[in-house]
């Protein structure tokens, strides 16, 4: 691309987080839910994801979006906010690794979220929390990115072949046991 002429871009991955599709899924399963909270962390990915969601929901009627923002919240305050959320709201998981104090969360943090509000419908727009916390979501399929990235790098290093951009497809994923327990 002409706007990147001073960079040597030879390939990369393009992902799309489909907010509309996730809200559609939630509305299908929970038709009375119109209020949501998006959880994002204090990282570039978290800030970017929050900006995407803000942009997407700005023109939507009948949707109220709250933000649990890792730039201003600690892990403890995030848990406190989630504890107080009513079950007629849904929590959207975006990213959560780093809080406002640059503290990193650990792998079992999703269980703590669940323990704080076990009746809260939780959905993932990025794939996090699909280990017993999120009911489901529509998000990019990251499962084979490492292998594909290695192939792209090796093709460039060995043969100087630019690979272009690889589009990561999205898919719906659900935790069947959690869906049963919520319906």
What do the PLM-derived regions correspond to, one by one?
Residues 1-183:
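Short hydrophobic alpha-helices and adjacent helix-cap/hinge residues
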